[in-house]
Amino acid sequence: MASPRTPVSPPELPEKNFQYRQVQYWDQRYKDAADSGPYEWFGDFASFRALLEPELCPEDRILVLGCGNSALSYELFLGGFPNVTSVDYSPVVVAAMQVRYAHVPSLRWETMDVRALDFPSGSFDVVLEKGTLDAMLAGEPDPWNVSSEGVHTVDQVLSEVGFQKRTRQLFGSHTQLELVLAGLILVLAALLLGCLVALWVHRDPAHSTCVTEACIRVAGKILESLDRGVSPCQDFYQFSCGGWIRRNPLPNGRSRWNTFNSLWDQNQAILKHLLENTTFNSSSEAERKTRSFYLSCLQSERIEKLGAKPLRDLIDKIGGWNITGPWDEDSFMDVLKAVAGTYRATPFFTVYVSADSKSSNSNIIQVDQSGLFLPSRDYYLNRTANEKVLTAYLDYMVELGVLLGGQPTSTREQMQQVLELEIQLANITVPQDQRRDEEKIYHKMSISELQALAPAVDWLEFLSFLLSPLELGDSEPVVVYGTEYLQQVSELINRTEPSILNNYLIWNLVQKTTSSLDQRFETAQEKLLETLYGTKKSCTPRWQTCISNTDDALGFALGSLFVKATFDRQSKEIAEGMINEIRSAFEETLGDLVWMDEKTRLAAKEKADAIYDMIGFPDFILEPKELDDVYDGYEVSEDSFFQNMLNLYNFSAKVMADQLRKPPSRDQWSMTPQTVNAYYLPTKNEIVFPAGILQAPFYAHNHPKALNFGGIGVVMGHELTHAFDDQGREYDKEGNLRPWWQNESLTAFQNHTACMEEQYSQYQVNGERLNGLQTLGENIADNGGLKAAYNAYKAWLRKHGEEQPLPAVGLTNHQLFFVGFAQVWCSVRTPESSHEGLVTDPHSPARFRVLGTLSNSRDFLRHFGCPVGSPMNPGQLCEVW
């Protein structure tokens, strides 16, 4: 449930300043505001988040003094700080807040005078207040010569909660008087701002500036993210995000932080509340399974007590591991079937069931390259540059082997052999930028033909085990992506010693399962992640890890809880309307392309018309019987987290087998409803926008349309344009991989994409160039999505007229569209994480998703007046759509 957000007018000020100290004034004020939303003094939680989070841990007991009807306490809860007590000496507002947030039991509300707090000593770790101490000083006759009584009152409150020492640590050696004066300056600044707003409204009877609470709030967020010291034509990313970057240092334990991470943290807090406070008596069985799974993950004491035993027992059951004890030397196929079949690890290759790209109405077995633990083959092959990572990885392998019972010296020797095998795998793995032409890498063959291609594996035996109880024969069709890779893998298996093969297979199982074991395994992984991504050990609570695990295991059952509690059905209708507006704008662009012939243009328009959109969630999650059917057969217990994970792997294999003889279903989403993301699926020609992304800053019903089109509108345009990027354009309107372009148009398309590939290949991060080919599809989608969304916004303006501008930001609504787009991508990353993104991510880094796209936008250059030759207007524009 979201915090109430009805617009709030500025409150009536008391006749005399000292009335701020009288409970009668506040009681009357809150009675008058009974139907209004929260009123925030000096800003909301987001305004101070960057300052607060370094001082807070999720376990902190927080006291909020003088809470009023602010949403601060609830927003702290949503931000991952659930233990909040709020006090105010107006019983009227306390009663109102108890009712408003009755659905959040961890929030406590007390009627209390801050000058006489009735809490035991040591009850709180952190104390927050916004203006309460200033209000206590409101009766001072001379704000520049505060009376000793006034200073004593402030000091008394701080001492009462044991906060005085911490305050001095935060503010150094400043005197109490200096601290009080600092507070008074904030009050005066707030009053001055109020006067300026009132003066503006008075001088402009037409109220041309939007002064609703939503407009004021979002204007504040935009302003605090901007860096006005940078010209927008010099560096628009820094102009739009410089303030945000200063205010958002990387949280502990994170290698990157951005809007997506922030929203996912917020969604996790909501899911935590739902799992811990929902009465599941009338829920579906699938929803009850989410709670049982989540609780099993939270049982840290039991997990610690079991230690490594669950995995050691599993290894023994499979046939042993040469690193830790006896093993069966003739068991390669049996171990491969167990590791890759029963427990769904991916040594050497990955096997899955999905829609046939050339016959999208049917599912087919598919085989592709896999088998590397590190994020990219580059980490194995560029050994000089990645020596630290390879050393840390080997140390991690050895530490886990020893934790599972191996001897340090022999474990290191054998793990070195496993690492060398992975390096050989990396050598034959095809780089992602060489796999972009799906027509070239798609190879359909029978199992018998696959057997001839890669004879080291008994494919009929393996696939029959994997897809049991289905009966397969030698003629069963299979799609292989990368025949040369599989051929070389087969040769690699044949020339590798059986003991090394066994160690490698079991190592894949160990990688898959150690996250379900005790803290020692987590600590070992943290050391590797620090080297790989630059992360530091964090105080990330166990519940947050468990929410992610529950989402992975039972994401759609969890999504049912999330959607019922948070999703506004009106958002779905509005999103549908926006998609249609953006589709129309894209199709108008198709009509203007001079390089496309008429036959290809008509087929492209038909494909755009045929794109199917899915908004919010699949319908089945709100039908208890259908939802239960999805997870029927998955056994979940509160007693064993490790066994729940093993059951999940086995269950997913059965689900995969069940899909093979069925046609693909539109209800089968690739993302759960709470996910903060979106995607395009070419074999269904569909775009999907989960509920998790349909919220601010991407979308809010009371935000200016300029921001909504610049936020979720660009995301919608991006996903729609994927249907026509260098890979999506190979699929027709039915989702089938086939050539449907005329040769002349295809040649022209490739010339335009070559410009974009070259453009992005010139950008650098920490002296390392982007791969313009690897990121080509996403760059095409970014550029096309921005153009379609902006054209849709212009069409909306023609129909509805100009919007009121936001106060204080000094931007036209057209400029606001581009700032809104850019601020969605404000981001901070460690250097290690930035490198990992360059070698693995098909997206460009956030900075260049903004700079690259806008420097190609004629509309942006016109509205910001960037002259040719300025950094944002280099003179040559790359346009595809």
UniProtKB/Swiss-Prot annotation:
Q: What are the disulfide bonds?
A: 210-215, 233-866, 241-826, 297-546, 755-878
Which reaction does this enzyme catalyse, per its entry? Hydrolysis of the 21-Trp-|-Val-22 bond in big endothelin to form endothelin 1
Query: Could you tell me which residue ranges are on the Cytoplasmic side of the membrane?
Result: 1-178
Catalytic positions are 719, 782 (proton donor)
| Membrane topology listed for this record | Single-pass type II membrane protein
Name the needed cofactors: Zn(2+)
Q: Which InterPro entries match?
A: MetalloPept_cat_dom_sf, Methyltransf_25, Peptidase_M13, Peptidase_M13_C, Peptidase_M13_dom_2, Peptidase_M13_N, SAM-dependent_MTases_sf
Please give the residue positions where the record annotates the modification Phosphotyrosine: 39
Q: Which GO terms describe its biological process?
A: brain development; cardioblast differentiation; heart development; methylation; peptide hormone processing
Q: Which residues form the Peptidase M13 domain?
A: 209-881
Q: What is its main location?
A: Golgi
Name one cellular component (GO) term: cytoplasmic vesicle membrane
- Family, similarity comment: In the N-terminal section; belongs to the methyltransferase superfamily. In the C-terminal section; belongs to the peptidase M13 family.
- Identify this protein by name: EEF1AKMT4-ECE2 readthrough transcript protein
